């Protein structure tokens, strides 16, 4: 297959950052994506409706002329978030979900939730008003090996939340393990998951074997090949519970290439092209449209996009860097070729 036309896709998990960087991140993701779920882990985080709506306005101001791109906003949950704030956010019409960051789990998560029991009243309110619950599924206990933190979170925390709030729609974000695939597959229809392009294309050998490659360092961290294969199997299965979420997370080049580098991989420059590569690798290009364009809006009870994009099997070379505000970001596949491009 050398051309494939699909309904315009959406990105159900992205980091757009703020300030001078917004112009560049919004330009990249709005080229082919119709909508994106925008992460709220800014500095300071978007912990209330006013902050999230102000962020929405800043994003919209950077959308290029002619683009219909629509950001979908998310509330950042803290120990102090109130049920009233959830109701207010839902009523805004712009905020479609709230996000659990276990405190310290990832970039700018220090304001996050210290004990999930602290937000049970909030989860009850979310269940009542029909707001989605997005989860960074890792424990933060330093005694737990970093490669085990997703599995332990599912076993010790997420399984309890799912049991206690059966009507709450939950997205386990950027899953990285067979454990997560199995959990989501076996859970009720109210539990779904996003999968990144880089977790489909790469495993920890790419990051660690033959030298450390810091631009593959992200959280949750890349796992072993057997987990990568489970993710590919889930994405290509046609199962409606799995959908596209890039978790594209830009950091300046010097913040990645450092003695203590930041976690995050940038894929917004070529998101759908990279997913096409991943699906082609398992002979499943016929399943790409459902994963990229149908399953996400269906789970969120939003309409599917009405227009299409066409991907062509035509190699192109990725630049070594892209502009990111007043600095540069090194994208995934920097200086190398990608097999697909959008016509």
From Swiss-Prot:
Its EC number is 3.5.2.3. Zn(2+) 1 binds at residues 13, 15, 99, 247. Gene3D superfamilies: Metal-dependent hydrolases. One of its GO terms (molecular function) is zinc ion binding. SUPFAM superfamilies: Metallo-dependent hydrolases. One of its GO terms (cellular component) is cytosol. It comes from Shewanella putrefaciens (strain CN-32 / ATCC BAA-453). Binds 2 Zn(2+) ions per subunit. PANTHER family: DIHYDROOROTASE. This is Dihydroorotase. Coiled coil: none annotated. Its cofactor is Zn(2+). Zn(2+) 2 binds at residues 99, 136, 174. Signal peptide: none annotated. Keywords: Hydrolase, Metal-binding, Pyrimidine biosynthesis, Zinc. GO terms for biological process: 'de novo' pyrimidine nucleobase biosynthetic process; 'de novo' UMP biosynthetic process.
